[in-house]
Amino acid sequence: MTYVVTDNCIACKYTDCVEVCPVDCFYEGENTLVIHPDECIDCGVCEPECPADAIRPDTEPGMEDWVEFNRTYASQWPVITIKKDPMPDHKKYDGETGKREKYFSPNPGTGD
């Protein structure tokens, strides 16, 4: 099992989760984070840290797409281990559905 970052992180990008990860498996895009599913050790410490409830176990129904999404972008984006401020309008987007289709950017973030 692994954990994956899902839709609600997009356009919010809280980074509370990255500082608690013992294996540094979070990667930063321009407006979201992802977890490298092959590096995640399934410890679960990141899940309760996410204010947007965007981190889910891959065993939940419908997570297959998110596993591949996370794997794809983790191989392209820089690692992030230090907490940063969320996106400027994060409160506006938190909880909105369909954010991947509306707002996702494939551009990398800056990393640490």
UniProtKB/Swiss-Prot annotation:
Organism of provenance: Rhodobacter capsulatus (strain ATCC BAA-309 / NBRC 16581 / SB1003)
Main function: Ferredoxins are iron-sulfur proteins that transfer electrons in a wide variety of metabolic reactions.
The entry's keywords: 3Fe-4S, 4Fe-4S, Electron transport, Iron, Iron-sulfur, Metal-binding, Repeat, Transport
NCBIfam families named among the record's database cross-references: FdxA_Protbact
Region annotation Disordered: where it falls in the sequence: 85-112
Record keyword Iron present: yes
Required cofactor names: [4Fe-4S] cluster; [3Fe-4S] cluster
InterPro entries: 4Fe4S_Fe-S-bd, 4Fe4S_Fe_S_CS, 7Fe_ferredoxin, Fd_C, FdxA, RnfB_subfamily
A GO term, aspect molecular function: metal ion binding
Biased composition (Basic and acidic residues): 85-103
Occurrences of domain 4Fe-4S ferredoxin-type (ranges): 2-30, 31-60
Domain of life the protein comes from: Bacteria
Protein name: Ferredoxin-2
Residues engaged in binding [4Fe-4S] cluster: C21, C40, C43, C46
Matching Pfam families: DUF3470, Fer4
